[in-house]
A protein has these predicted regions:
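Short, glycine-/small- and polar/acidic-enriched structural segments
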Residues: 2-152, 156-161, 179-181
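Phosphate/pyrophosphate-binding betaalpha-module
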Residues: 167
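Extracytoplasmic/periplasmic substrate-binding proteins
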Residues: 170-183
Length: 183
C-alpha cells in the first residue's frame, strides 16, 4: 500500500445517485486508498456551481458534462477534462403520464424545467431542431429539484436523470412516469 497523500476532493455533479456508482464502488473496495489517495467525495448545493468551484481551486476535481468545461475555459478558468464516467449521460425529459406528454413536440404550451446555465439553451436548441418555436413553451429554472417541481405543479416536464429522478417521481406520485432520453 502506498503512503496516503493529503486529502483529494471530488465534487459530484449532482446528489449522489446511481450515475456515481463507479466512484462509490471504487471507494468501498479501497481502490483510491491503494493508490495513495484519500478521497473526499462531496455533493454540490447547486450543480451549476461545480465548474466555477473547480476553476477557483476550491476542490481538486469535479464532474460535469464537457460543455461546461468548454464554457468555463471561455470564462478564463484553467480546467482540463481528464476522463468520462459514462459514454452518454442518462438525462432526458421526465413527466407524469397524466401530463399528456408523449413526445418532445408535446412541450408546446407546457412549463419545462431545466438545470443550470445551459439547460434553457439545450431545450431551446432541441426545440428549434424539432421545428418548435421556443416562445411556444415556458422554461423554468428548477435546479436539482425536478421531482419536487413536478409534484408542486411548478413545471409539467423537465430535464432530469432518468436513472433515479424518474423512479423517485413515480414513487412520490404513485403514477407512471414518461421519459424521453436526450442524447
Amino acid at each position: 500500500m502506498q503512503t496516503l497523500h493529503s486529502r483529494t476532493t471530488l465534487l459530484l455533479n449532482w446528489r449522489a445517485n446511481p450515475y456515481h456508482t463507479p466512484i462509490f464502488v471504487a471507494q468501498a473496495k479501497g481502490y483510491y486508498r491503494q493508490e495513495g489517495i484519500q478521497l473526499a467525495i462531496m455533493e454540490p448545493n447547486d450543480p451549476s456551481d461545480v465548474t466555477e468551484i473547480v476553476g477557483l481551486g476550491k476542490v481538486d476535481f469535479g464532474l460535469k458534462a464537457m460543455i461546461h468545461t468548454v464554457a468555463a475555459r471561455a470564462k478564463g478558468y484553467h480546467l482540463t477534462s481528464i476522463g468520462t464516467l459514462l459514454d452518454e449521460p442518462p438525462t432526458g425529459l421526465i413527466a407524469l403520464k397524466s401530463s399528456g406528454i408523449k413526445t418532445f413536440h408535446d412541450i408546446v404550451g407546457k412549463r419545462v424545467g431545466y438545470i443550470g446555465e445551459f439547460g434553457k439553451k439545450i431545450i431551446d436548441d432541441l426545440a428549434i431542431l424539432a421545428g418548435i418555436e421556443p416562445t411556444s413553451y415556458e422554461t423554468v429554472r428548477i435546479g436539482m429539484n425536478l421531482s419536487d417541481a413536478i409534484c408542486r405543479n411548478k413545471v409539467d416536464v423537465g430535464i432530469g436523470f432518468i436513472n433515479f429522478q424518474r423512479v423517485e417521481l413515480a414513487h412520490l406520485r404513485g403514477e407512471t412516469v414518461f421519459y424521453l432520453l436526450i442524447n
